[in-house]
A protein has these predicted regions:
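Conserved CoA-thioester-binding segment of acyl-CoA-metabolizing enzymes
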Residues: 1-55, 85
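Hydrophobic/aromatic residues within transmembrane alpha-helices
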Residues: 15, 52, 64, 109-111, ...
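Glycine- (often His-adjacent) and acidic-residue-rich active-site loop
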Residues: 39, 46, 54-89, 102
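Glycine-rich beta-to-alpha active-site loop
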Residues: 56, 86-131
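Short helix- or helix-capping micro-motifs
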Residues: 61-63, 143, 151-160
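Acidic, divalent-metal-coordinating active-site segment for phosphoryl/phosphodiester hydrolysis
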Residues: 104, 159-166
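C-terminal long alpha-helix characteristic of the crotonase
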Residues: 117-122, 164, 170-197
């Protein structure tokens, strides 16, 4: 079974994390699939918006650390770097529909999304300090810009998680919804009706 599902519905591409047995821990192969899908969508005039979501209860438990230990993503052109480059430079509206745990990259990728819709019970976590890791995806720059230095420092230095209400208050997410994917689809459909730029 594919660990990244791709569905095109008219002008909307939905990319679904589909590794529920590992709470969608992201592997190098998954990163490369996501990077390739985003690159393709970026060059496809017919695609007007992209949604990233989950097929299960949790958005993602972050990077699959065992996979990363086998081949650390140190080089330019690695699957992780390809994904980060694609998500950072993506020129079309990128919407995330999330629920459950959004750990590590599950939170940091959201800084690169245009609209984020989260379930009320979503927990956001960037536990880099707990793992002895450096924050990824530009998060140590982007998170303080979003929430202010004091709030960002508290989260980064303690590794504490936060909920959807806090995420909404500080502007990390646009909306809390009991049905994040349905809400994200409505937003994507509205975007798709706008004139192309």
């Amino acid at each position: 079974m594919a660990e990244i599902l791709r569905e095109v519905d008219g002008p909307i591409l939905t990319l679904t994390l589909n590794r529920p047995e590992k709470q969608n821990a992201i592997t190098r192969e998954m990163y490369q699939t996501l990077a390739s899908a985003l690159a393709e969508a970026n060059g496809d005039f017919a695609i007007r918006a992209v949604i990233i979501t989950t097929s299960s209860q949790h958005f993602t438990s972050g990077n699959d650390l065992f996979d990363f230990l086998n081949a650390p993503p140190l080089e330019p052109g690695s699957p992780v770097m390809n994904f980060l480059e694609q998500i950072h430079n993506f020129s079309k509206p990128l919407i995330a529909a999330i629920s459950g745990n959004a750990v590590g990259i599950g939170t940091t990728m959201l800084f690169h999304c245009d609209v984020v819709v989260a379930a009320p019970t979503t927990r956001f976590s960037m536990p880099f300090v707990n793992l002895g890791l450096v924050p990824e995806a530009g998060s140590s720059l982007l998170f303080p810009r979003l929430v202010g230095y004091q709030r960002a420092a508290k989260v980064f230095l303690t590794g504490e998680s936060f909920d959807s209400e806090f995420a909404l208050e500080v502007g990390l997410i646009a909306e809390i919804s009991e049905t994040p994917l349905a809400s994200a689809r409505l937003i994507a459909e509205k975007i798709a009706t706008q004139p192309p730029s």
